């Protein structure tokens, strides 16, 4: 990779300052239950790359050592990583705020029937993605039936308190 810092020193580019890192985004893998045409990481059900246990342990140690406040989980569908629930539970036990970038349809997948309840029990913040409010557009981008499955996922989360007034669960 080309080092561009020396080039910046020769310009009037303003100095860049930063404070301590308080949010860490971690990609847990490229496996996903969808195959979206617009996916920037080309995630799909055929992808197998995933964060392993050793890396997860390093991540948890880093969170503690650097006093990271927020862990932002992404993928693919981060929930399909075999260590997802353990990572969430252990990060929450450290007092770390956890965000899950959820495609909503994962909540309806076989083997994930209790996922919404797990997320609520752990007070995980959900960043839900739905690329459009029109069924035809969503299904064209993400696959047939994704719009309705996404709404079903939202209903599950709403029933648990996500997005409801006076609830501490963030959607």
Regions found by a protein language model. Name each.
Residues 2-75, 79-97:
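Conserved alpha-helical substructure of the radical SAM core
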Residues 53-72, 81-171:
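Radical SAM/AdoMet-radical enzyme domain recognition
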